């Protein structure tokens, strides 16, 4: 057993992994890309890549963690077994810390938006002015601090127990709230135009290479394959759990979350005659304008931002857990000291990049360069340094039927090759995730 404990159930493990995977990309990027790149036609390459990355990408990271019985730094040292091994894992760990720093800033905006809804400040003032004020340097420190306080308090106690309990509450709540939003939105006049945007297939887009590139990037980043975060969750996994099955369940629920977001967001946007966009503008400018115009808008705006907060907190938990677990073991410090140190560093750095332009550039560097390279490093480490025989032995635990040669081919040759392509295309396209 890992000294931080084990997940008590497969359900708890899967929900924790879904919590890590479901994040801002599902909410502010997937709905737009689904409509922009061919509607239902986009789902064909997207589902292919989700299945592939879920099966051989997630499974590999889970298996490495369970085999090594430790997270990022220890797992890479376990594989490389040389004097450089203890240093190799620092790059993926830097990716986890870097994305956590930027993510905490964005979650601070979500918390500030919740406050704006509760006080009615969001709707009584100009929405663009509210957003501009919120994203200035040092303008959102209290909400930003609250984000990290909540997350660190959840991580302070026994790791697996806190993570499992938090995700068993927050992830079902996320799905329930978005289902309610999707049902309400379906009753709007003009919602049909949003459904057409999302689901009327434009088959010619399948001949467009950009459709496949964006589907691949969306699927890859949506599953939190970073060469770090999912390894630490694997380290907390019992030997009797079927890893490939749990990986596919994670991929399925992540896809359902993305589809729910699309069903709740785009029909609402079209109902009020607003042009669809992606990214922070969709969440913090377009959707508040929709809520402002609709009956009971405050109520549904609160529903929406609370749902986003749930998804964001569960993702941030995983990012910080990867760092805390590694620091615990590398520096031989208590869990509370590791969490406190991680929280302080994250807060200090993230406060300095609160400005919307600065955090945008920060996230670009992390998501275009660091995380794709770290994910590639993880893929090579698992499939070539650790090797197929050791990986297969771990994957077969808890299964009635052993994994076959198809898994080896998809992982060792297709997945690793695509990880290289994702890194290159991300740089060429200035981001595909």
Task: Put a short name on every predicted segment.
Residues 88-93, 323, 330-343, 365-427:
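C-terminal membrane-solvent junction of multi-pass transporters and transport-like membrane proteins
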Residues 2-5, 32-37, 67-91, 104-162, ...:
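Inter-helical loop and helix-membrane interface segments of multi-pass membrane transporters/permeases
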Residues 74, 107-135, 236-240, 245, ...:
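Helix-loop-helix connectors at the membrane interface of multi-pass transporters/channels
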Residues 1-29, 57-62, 66-79, 83-87, ...:
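Membrane-interface "cap" regions at the ends of multi-pass membrane proteins
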Residues 29-46, 80, 161-170, 245, ...:
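Transmembrane helix-loop boundary segments of multi-pass membrane transporters
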Residues 6, 12-14, 20, 138-142, ...:
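Loop-to-transmembrane helix boundary motifs in multi-pass membrane proteins
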Residues 2-7, 11, 164, 168-313, ...:
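Membrane-embedded translocation segments of transport machinery
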Residues 9-49, 228-234, 241-248, 252-255, ...:
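Transmembrane helix-boundary motif of multi-pass solute transporters/channels
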């Amino acid at each position: 057993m890992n000294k931080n404990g084990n997940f008590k159930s497969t359900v708890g493990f899967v929900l924790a992994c879904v919590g890590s995977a479901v994040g801002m990309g599902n909410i502010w990027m997937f709905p737009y890309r689904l409509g922009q790149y061919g509607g239902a036609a986009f789902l064909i390459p997207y589902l292919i890549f989700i299945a592939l990355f879920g099966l051989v990408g997630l499974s590999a990271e889970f298996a490495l963690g369970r085999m090594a019985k430790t997270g990022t730094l220890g797992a890479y040292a376990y594989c490389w077994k040389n004097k450089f091994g203890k240093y190799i894992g620092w790059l993926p760990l830097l990716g986890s810390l870097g994305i956590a720093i930027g993510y905490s800033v964005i979650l601070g905006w979500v918390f500030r938006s919740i406050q704006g809804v509760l006080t009615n400040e969001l709707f009584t003032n100009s929405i663009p002015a509210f957003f501009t004020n919120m994203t200035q340097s040092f303008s959102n420190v209290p909400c930003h601090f609250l984000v990290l306080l909540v997350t660190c308090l959840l991580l302070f106690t026994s790791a697996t127990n806190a993570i499992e309990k938090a995700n068993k509450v927050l992830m079902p709540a996320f799905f329930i709230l978005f289902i309610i939003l999707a049902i309400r939105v379906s009753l709007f006049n003009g919602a049909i135009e949003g459904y057409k945007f999302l689901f009327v297939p434009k088959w010619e887009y399948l001949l467009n290479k950009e459709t496949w590139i964006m589907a691949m990037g969306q699927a890859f980043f949506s599953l939190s394959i970073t060469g770090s975060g999912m390894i630490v969750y694997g380290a907390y996994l019992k030997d009797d759990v079927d890893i490939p099955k749990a990986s596919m369940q994670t991929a399925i629920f992540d896809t359902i979350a993305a589809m729910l977001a699309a069903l709740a967001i785009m029909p609402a946007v079209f109902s009020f005659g607003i042009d669809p966009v992606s990214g922070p503008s969709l969440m913090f400018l377009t959707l508040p304008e929709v809520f402002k115009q609709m009956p009971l808008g405050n109520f549904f705006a609160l529903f929406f931002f609370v749902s986003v907060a749930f998804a964001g907190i569960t993702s941030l938990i995983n990012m910080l857990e990867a760092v805390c677990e590694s620091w615990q073991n590398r520096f031989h410090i208590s869990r509370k000291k590791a969490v406190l140190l991680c929280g302080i560093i994250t807060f200090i750095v993230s406060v300095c990049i609160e400005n919307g332009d600065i955090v945008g550039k920060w996230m670009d560097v992390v998501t275009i360069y660091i995380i794709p390279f770290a994910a590639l490093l993880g893929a090579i480490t698992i499939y070539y340094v650790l090797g197929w025989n050791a990986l297969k032995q771990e994957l077969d635990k808890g299964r009635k039927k052993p994994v076959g040669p198809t898994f080896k081919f998809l992982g060792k040759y297709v997945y690793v090759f695509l990880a290289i392509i994702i890194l290159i295309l991300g740089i060429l396209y200035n981001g595909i995730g």
